[in-house]
Amino acid sequence: MNDHTYDVAILGAGIAGSALAVMLARHGVSTLLIDAGTHPRFSIGESTVPVTTLLWRGMAERFDVPELNHLAGFEHVRENISSACGIKKNFGFLYHHRG
């Protein structure tokens, strides 16, 4: 049994929970990251739109976590994380009208 006390517990090790955990830990916050699933698996955030790269770059700089730049663009993901990925052109919806 682990008797360690954590400052923060994050439920969900998806892209948002993992990013938050690394940002907090980088700044000295004792962080516990908990997830019910196992990887690899599809998860929300696995597909993002290009504008998201600006957010990753901003968080990398603001919170001094340069590793987040690995998520800031298709070429960075393929080079630093996995070559088993592609580019999602857009998220969109189709509307069907009678007639």
Model region roles, listed by residue range:
Residues 13, 23, 81-85:
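Short secondary-structure boundary/capping segments within folded domains
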Residues 5, 28, 88-90:
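A structure-centric signal for secondary-structure junctions around beta-strands
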Residues 20-29, 55:
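A short, Lys/Arg-enriched amphipathic alpha-helix followed by its capping loop at the start of a domain
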Residues 2-16, 32:
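Beta1/beta-strand and adjacent pyrophosphate-binding region of the FAD-binding site
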Residues 16, 20, 39:
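Conserved Rossmann-like nucleotide-cofactor binding loop
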Residues 41-98:
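N-terminal FAD cofactor-binding segment of flavoenzymes
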Residues 9, 25-46:
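Glycine-rich FAD pyrophosphate-binding loop
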